[in-house]
């Protein structure tokens, strides 16, 4: 069990680890008891010390910034939190530490714009499930996300469960090279639950946007959503010079009165407002009203550039026009949408409007949170649909031979292609989906002035990928290798705001065996409290 709230004593969760640990000691909880950040033995090749000037030397640098460009072999200079130079053979003097990146790919960290991290202990539980029992009668199983995760599991979470789930899920993604997350956890049953989530996000040591959403299925007497947003913002998120930001959750499926209140609170605080927008929840007419500026109980809520919409499946032309014209952001979770019956991921619709999405993981109770899967799924889905559109235009086989030796004369030889229509979207490329997973993620979270590319002046959120491993070598094309071949085993080093968090394949300052025990204890409690039997070979 996580030590955050031992003996059922809720603790005040401060905006820094130092204050948090002091508070723990003051309540009789020794900081050593946490054992989350145990010292590691010295390595033969140690990472740069925090704040030390260093250069990443000799890697294949993919900056994702057209003005900076790409380099087959180049260096990245980091001073403090920021990138100060990118280019070949940088002259950095003798005081800079050197990270040897030969045989490696150096690129920006991935950015996940929608992740329900509180569900980490429920990984794989819903691998065969769909979103909701929609009454279709199709054989999709009775174990659905809405009925099980939100209505059975979510209500029994304690603050200590929130903490360890958020912490472990965040560290797992950090290990995978995801340096920024928008945490969308509908687990805010009480202010203590919210504080536990925020503290875990801080303790993960990566950049995050804290999404303040409702508490799913709760009847807690201390339920304070959405009013507690004001306290949370004032306590944790007023500084712009930190790794953390806040986003206001404003789910329109909660009803006109509640979402109007949450949207108005968010806009008063100057926050982005995020919501799941998808047809299985009957949201199409609500989005149509918002597109007309007639949303909410008073019919005065409209769309804006401060909106971040998740999924956007099954929406009308009017809804899409409103989102486009407002300059709102869209996050697509391709693998989840394809598997859980959210509807067709709207990548072709976005292309037709000149829009691009960011990428997101959604839920690990069904699918993996690694970003290589997100990028591949995006590219594969768009291409299978587009390729079939192209094939459907083909005319009957033409007798012209392919020119291949021994080609049987009775086998169709070639399709005759008409001129393709002007509005046919372009096939996505590996570079496109890399942009979706980095630059577009930063834009979606209003962080593009800080991160998303290897641009001098931006903060150093950098990943170093090993291209010498057996699944990649020989390296022939950098974007293709990252998207088409790599997985988390290739993520060798991860840097957040200049600080090395993963080094030579290992997370730093983390006692994973201890955290794993805490996560498993939380899992056991959650299943028991929800009245759901644990069965390793059944999907219920």
Residue ranges and their predicted role:
Residues 24, 29, 33-40, 44-54, ...:
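Histidine-rich, glycine-flanked metal-binding segment
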Residues 45, 187-320:
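Metal-coordinating catalytic core of metallo-dependent amide/deamination hydrolases
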Residues 121-162, 281-306, 326-329, 373, ...:
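Active-site gating loops and adjacent loop-to-helix segments of metal-dependent hydrolytic enzymes
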Residues 125-184, 189-206, 227-239, 520-522:
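Alpha-helical scaffold segments that flank or form the walls of functional sites
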Residues 300-301, 348-469, 485:
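His/Asp/Glu-enriched, well-ordered alpha-helical/loop segment
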